[in-house]
A protein has these predicted regions:
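Membrane-proximal interfacial segments on either side of biological membranes
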Residues: 1-171
Length: 171
């Protein structure tokens, strides 16, 4: 199938349900692949982590049965992102991989400035987990980027940073 210039795919269906296949984002068409699970690959100019989280929560709220079936069939989403925004920070030319685990969604991010994982639990009372192996930030002259942000504006999150580099200084 080809929906637009930037979305195409090959899917195997049974009784109106997706069994497997490949969905391709971007200008290249999908190559023949396995149909044992659903895979999404490609590239896009922009992804916002908050939008992904909101989409998953809304999707699961609409139909738990459809969400469970999708989750069971999904092997992975692997996309190259021009600009990846995560909680107000922007990263350029990132690799993003999304998988469904037993009780949470997993977002793996690899970038020159960031390497880590965000875990979104199925339990809405469980905070989002950000497990950061490496984070390199450069300060700017604009002051505190979080000035004016209130705690009620943020989702509950647990952050574990193993290596933080700020302006070339390793903390």
């Amino acid at each position: 199938f080809e929906v637009t210039d930037g979305l195409s795919g090959m899917l195997k269906l049974a009784d109106g349900q997706v069994i497997g296949g490949l969905v391709r984002l971007g200008d290249t068409r999908p190559q023949v692949g396995a149909f044992d699970a659903l895979r999404v690959e490609g590239e896009t100019d922009y992804v916002g982590a908050e939008e992904w989280i909101e989409f998953i929560e809304a999707f699961e709220a609409v139909s738990a049965e459809d969400a469970a079936a999708f989750r069971d069939r999904l092997d992975y989403v692997a996309i190259n992102v021009g600009t990846l925004e995560i909680f107000g920070l922007e990263f350029l030319d990132s690799s993003l991989r999304v998988t469904a685990d037993v009780d949470h969604w997993v977002f793996d991010v690899i970038d020159d400035e960031l390497k880590g994982q965000i875990r979104l639990s199925d339990d809405p009372s469980t905070p989002v987990e950000a497990l950061i192996n490496y984070l390199s930030l450069t300060s700017d002259d604009e002051g505190d980027p979080l000035l004016g942000v209130q705690s009620e504006d943020l989702v509950p999150i647990h952050v574990d940073v193993r290596s933080l580099v700020l302006d070339d200084e390793d903390y």
